[in-house]
Structures are given as C-alpha cells and as structure tokens.
A protein has these predicted regions:
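Glycine- and hydrophobic-rich flexible loops that cap the catalytic core of alpha/beta enzyme folds
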Residues: 4-167
Length: 167
C-alpha cells in the first residue's frame, strides 16, 4: 500500500524563518543517522562564507528541504536532515564563540557598535536554539534549568533506538 501526500506545497523561506518554527524537527526512523564528517561541514561553511563574501542581495540557498507536516507538533524531515542538524550545530558553536567574545570584549565607546551587533546576532541565535523570545531569554539566562526541556530536533532512527544491539 502506498500512501501519497494529498498536496505538496512548496514554500520559499529564509533559513531564520525555517529554523524558528516552534514545532520539533524530527528525523524519522527510516532516515540514516547523522553522518556528516568534518569535510562535509567544512564545505557547508565555505559555501556560507562565499555567499557572505559576494555580498549578494538574493537570500542564501540552503537547499531543498522536504518536510512531512502531518504529525501535530513535529516537522518530519524527509530530506535535508543532515544540513539542518549541521546548521543547528553551527549555530550552537557560534553562540558559544560570540558569548566568549562578548565576555572578553572591552566595554569602550569604540567597541559599542560591534558589541550591539554581536548581541543582536546572539539574540537571534538564542531565539532559534532555545525557542525563546527576548522575555523568555532573560528568564533562561537567570535560570538555565528552564532551558533543559527545550528540544529542537529529535532523532528516532533505528540506530538510535537500538544502539545497544549494534555492538
């Protein structure tokens, strides 16, 4: 028996709009486990850097993402799970690095503009990683226990469900 989607609805979105969805990204069990290595990640990073260097007016092309939205509260990633996972890991690394830079930055008038710009970037990343608006961000920063239950991506692959049997 083959189940077909009743409707395929393509949507062009920015990466920010895609990642800021409130539903949990879910990797179905029939999808392969995360397998990108440093070389794959480096290619993505180089592609992003090249886009930034071009100072292009068109949005960055993240690639085609296919999502099954039939499960309430979840976005089942049919295609694009490797890129999505890698991009979320990249955002977490950027969050850590920007936080470190801000903590070590001199609080001078000359650095004020850079500090504001970095803080805005950090706020945007925080909103994606912790599903938090500015008000909720302040609550989380005061009590990090409030971030413990936040889930962005769920991997229910066979490899994850039966990892003890794979030894």
């Amino acid at each position: 028996r083959i189940c077909m989607a009743k409707e395929i609805e393509p949507k062009l979105q920015t990466i920010g709009a895609y990642l800021k969805k409130t539903d949990i990204f879910r990797i179905p069990e029939y999808q392969r486990a995360y397998s990108w290595n440093i070389s794959n990640c480096d290619k993505l990073w180089q592609d992003i850097e090249s886009y930034i260097d071009q100072d292009a007016e068109d949005p960055y092309f993240f690639g085609t993402i296919i999502i099954d939205c039939s499960m309430k509260g979840y976005l089942n990633l049919i295609d694009g799970q490797q890129r999505t996972t890698t991009f979320l890991l990249l955002l977490k690394a950027m969050h850590l690095r920007i936080t470190e830079i801000l903590n070590n930055m001199a609080d001078t008038e000359e650095a004020a503009g850079l500090r504001r710009s970095l803080q805005q970037s950090l706020d945007s990343i925080f909103e994606i990683l912790y599903r938090a608006d500015v008000r909720k961000q302040i609550e989380i920063e005061k009590n990090w226990d409030k971030a413990k239950g936040v889930q962005i991506i769920e991997n229910v692959s066979i490899n994850e469900l039966h990892k003890n049997e794979l030894k």
